Amino acid sequence: MAYIEGNTGKWEYVIGLEIHAQISSKSKLFSGSSTIFAANPNSQVSYVDAAMPGMLPVLNKHCVHQAIKTGLGLKAKINKYSVFDRKNYFYADLPQGYQISQFYYPIVQNGTMEIPTSTGDLKTIRINRLHLEQDAGKSMHDQSPHYSFIDLNRAGIGLMEIVTEPDISSPEEAAEFVKKLRNLLRYIGSCDGDMEKGSMRCDANISVRRSGEPLGTRCEIKNINSIRNIIKAIEFEAKRQVDLLESGEKIIQETRLFNADSGETRTMRLKEEALDYRYFPDPDLLPLVISDELINELKANLPELPDQKIEKYTKEFSLSKYDAEVIVADESVAEYFEKAANECNPKMLTNWLTSELFGQLNKASIGINECKITPSNFAKLVKLIENDTISGKIAKTVFEIMFETGKAPDKIVEEKGLVQVSDNNVLNTVIDEVIAENPESVEGYRSGKDKLFGFFVGQVMKKTGGKANPTLVNQLLKEKLSS
């Protein structure tokens, strides 16, 4: 367990997260308006989104399905009866004067997610609920020195708010949870998880306490927009609370904002309670009733999820858990790997994938979907190494050409004359030449200077243009030099 080191001893982190995940949907939660990112301001606003009098919301069925699938991925209970409520507050970018949410009867409850801890063990984080709600618009204060502007393109976009219990005990665990949740949402297809674009936002509820003591007063940090900032915000806020408590002051329950530039949190407003929002059922929307048939249908059509893939890779492909997790961390990489793994040695493929290919992709700043090397050609390269057609050293040269051109490895090997020399007679002839040309080195090796062996290997490689089979060269050289 991680601790905050105070002047008077150690303090524990107590952290709960609220994740706002924008639902992957072409239209909004209660209107047919488009959800395309970065459209011209107020170009995707219906009368419903603008809260014009008499306009009634109509629930988007696709958004409901996305929430159910996410709940199933979280091993949660899907409530067959849920209700939409009005959360009442006034803000300029909320034209209705209330937000449609689910307070009393959410669509999903009681889920779990396992995350790795610093000790290598798995820790279960309980999911209190997942509920549907609509997003607000966007206030813009930097367009004019005299006016503020409102963009309602985002108003009414469907969100899933995923709320954990306060089971998280360190900033790193919080980051692991968000990373794993984001990956799950991407596999399911219910959210793209792009935190930079704001389609996934994190609020952190943070308190501190001495070991064994009751929970302390919590503060909520709003709209943290990156994994790195989650760690920074929690570390700063927890230390701030410890400093206050150790100096005899009390923690005020409040909502705070994190400034990524300064690495500090600041007061935004005093924390509201549920009573402040005067929740009541929305009279314009009927309760949502979900059938067993729909739940079973959506469950049957779920894709293979990250934890299932990790288990499959460790069992079927004999990968280490670490390697499996690295591959599964990106759905596109996992898809690429599976296409190639059926045609070659999966372990060797993994080594080349995570070292050579990842390195080149990072250098080129592109994703695996933009890579010119097809999974089939990558598998062919691995097979050429497996069957000793080329050496690992030559394979790197071939790989670089493949990455630049997309050519098949066998054609590159043929065109460049890179086939590995594995003929014993040819290699013995070359070795005899090397031994004849270096009598003093031979005498030195036979008198106990074992390090000279590398010299002989290098000379053979030089004469064959680096194409000699290194395993055979070692074997034949030892036989020749010891005779």
Swiss-Prot record:
Pfam families: GatB_N, GatB_Yqey. It is an enzyme of class 6 (ligase). Belongs to the GatB/GatE family. GatB subfamily. It comes from the Bacteria. InterPro entries: Asn/Gln-tRNA_amidoTrfase_suB/E, Asn/Gln-tRNA_Trfase_suB/E_cat, Asn/Gln_amidotransferase, Asn/Gln_tRNA_amidoTrase-B-like, GatB, GatB_C_1, GatB_Yqey_C_2, Gln-tRNA_amidoTrfase_suB_CS. Keywords: ATP-binding, Ligase, Nucleotide-binding, Protein biosynthesis. Heterotrimer of A, B and C subunits. Its EC number is 6.3.5.-. This is Aspartyl/glutamyl-tRNA(Asn/Gln) amidotransferase subunit B. The keyword Protein biosynthesis applies. Allows the formation of correctly charged Asn-tRNA(Asn) or Gln-tRNA(Gln) through the transamidation of misacylated Asp-tRNA(Asn) or Glu-tRNA(Gln) in organisms which lack either or both of asparaginyl-tRNA or glutaminyl-tRNA synthetases. The reaction takes place in the presence of glutamine and ATP through an activated phospho-Asp-tRNA(Asn) or phospho-Glu-tRNA(Gln). GO terms for molecular function: asparaginyl-tRNA synthase (glutamine-hydrolyzing) activity; ATP binding; glutaminyl-tRNA synthase (glutamine-hydrolyzing) activity. HAMAP family: GatB. It catalyses: L-glutamyl-tRNA(Gln) + L-glutamine + ATP + H2O = L-glutaminyl-tRNA(Gln) + L-glutamate + ADP + phosphate + H(+); L-aspartyl-tRNA(Asn) + L-glutamine + ATP + H2O = L-asparaginyl-tRNA(Asn) + L-glutamate + ADP + phosphate + 2 H(+). One of its GO terms (biological process) is translation.
